[in-house]
Amino acid sequence: MAEKQLRILVTGAGRGIGRSIVDQLKKNPLQHKIAVTARTESELTAAVAGATGETLVIPADATDSAVPQKIIDTVISQWGGIDAIFLNAGEAQVLPIELTTDDVWNHILNLNTTAPMRFLRSATPQMKEQKFGRVIVIASIAGLMGEGFVTAYTASKHAVIGLVRSAAVELQKYGITVNALCPGYVDTPMLTKGLEVSAQRTGKTIDELREVLAAKQPGGRLLTADEVAEAALSFIDSDGTGQALWLDAATKKFY
């Protein structure tokens, strides 16, 4: 990982992959400065507990159009800049396409695609000025392939990969990299929530559905949030940009 202390923002930091990213950052001997944001303050407070470096807890709703700018401004005001952002906040709703209302569609696209764009847009001027930045988006294998009953989620992840690729081309000359990580099925609270809905639709148990998803992956199992976090953190040291890299559950390597 980086050889100097960094000022890092993690969105969706209260649980799942975001929480695991924070947990691994806390272990780094460089004592990175860690800002965390999500809706629930108690989850954020728990996430940064035990950190030896400086932390900022910023409870907020990323779907509010004004929030990303306010969060970036807070981090810069507190620490004089921002070096890396892990854009992890996201949501899926399991619905057949005929029941995917405009409200559902707009909410998912807002959180999964528009909010990352707003965070990136807000951080870009500071990163350009300091000629360094790392932006890592936790996308999904659903951004590289189709998946039934999660139309809005799949569309949002395809779109955010387009955002990553375009921004990477534009910002590379400023020392800013923008990359997406596309893990397969990850054992997180969001996955469990989706399986609960699928169980009602299919009549299968949650355990049976977990086995179905695990069988789709090269390793025959679900990824863990820690595995995804470890892969995401590797982007900090890389000069590569514009990538949408698939992480599988067999070798834990990129494709």
Positions of PLM-derived features:
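Residue(s) in the substrate-gating loop at a strand-loop-helix junction
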Residues: 140
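Conserved glycine-rich cofactor-binding loop
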Residues: 14-15
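Substrate-binding pocket helix/loop in short-chain dehydrogenase/reductase
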Residues: 96-97, 104-109, 213
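Active-site helix of classical SDR
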Residues: 120, 156, 164
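Alpha-helical segment proximal to the catalytic Tyr-Lys
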Residues: 125, 169-173
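Conserved glycine-rich Rossmann-like NAD(P)H-binding loop of the short-chain dehydrogenase/reductase
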Residues: 26-46
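Short C-terminal tail/terminal secondary-structure segment
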Residues: 145, 237-255
